[in-house]
Design a protein with these regions (language model features):
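A short C-terminal helix-loop "cap" of Rossmann-like NAD(P)-dependent dehydrogenase/epimerase domains
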Residues: 1-21, 79-83
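Weak global preference for isoleucine
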Residues: 3-5, 15, 25, 56, ...
């Protein structure tokens, strides 16, 4: 699980390749996460809530596979098709920590924090994009983004999967 923020381009990091494309993702938006924290501070929270572990997730409306999240995000950013921008071997094939959490509904039962899903999140991403980025993404060919932005991120950064393979790490 992860907290989804509207400034998606600030997350351009090699970790985007650490996840297998078929990984199940359940996120929680920044607003819903903030509401969760605020609601946890209320006097009305029952005593049995405390001293337990919970998985924070946005529920069914915030569940999708990583490949779906990547493609829908690239669409909103105006970047194009995932297969035109990346290579399959840039992505890990196993062992990442995201899942769908059945018990995140227990937390929702206590704190009533959920109000947003994938569609609302992607609307926030689009609204947060500066005009120059919206225009730039639409006029820049996918091969340029792949070659000068995403490939270096996948291959040249010490935290990237392909760097590890290329440098026997």
């Amino acid at each position: 699980t992860f907290i989804a923020i509207a400034d998606l381009t600030s997350l351009m990091d090699p970790i985007m390749f650490h996840q297998p494309l078929d990984t199940c993702i359940e996120f929680c938006t920044m607003e819903d996460s903030g509401r969760l924290l605020a609601n946890a501070c209320e006097d009305s929270v029952p005593e049995e809530f405390w001293r337990r572990f919970y998985n924070i997730g946005g529920g069914e409306r915030c569940r999708l596979n990583y490949i779906e999240l990547q493609q829908r995000s690239f669409d909103v950013l105006g970047m194009g098709k995932l297969e035109d921008l990346t290579e399959r071997n840039w992505f890990a094939t196993r062992n990442f920590h995201c899942h769908w959490f059945e018990d995140s509904d227990v937390l929702e039962g206590y704190l009533r924090f959920r109000s947003q899903g994938v569609d609302e999140y992607l609307q926030q991403v689009q609204a947060a994009l500066p005009a120059w980025q919206r225009i730039g993404a639409r006029v820049t060919p996918a091969w340029l983004v792949k070659r000068f932005v995403l490939r270096p991120l996948a291959r040249n950064h010490p935290d990237s999967t392909m760097y590890w393979l290329d440098h026997d790490r």
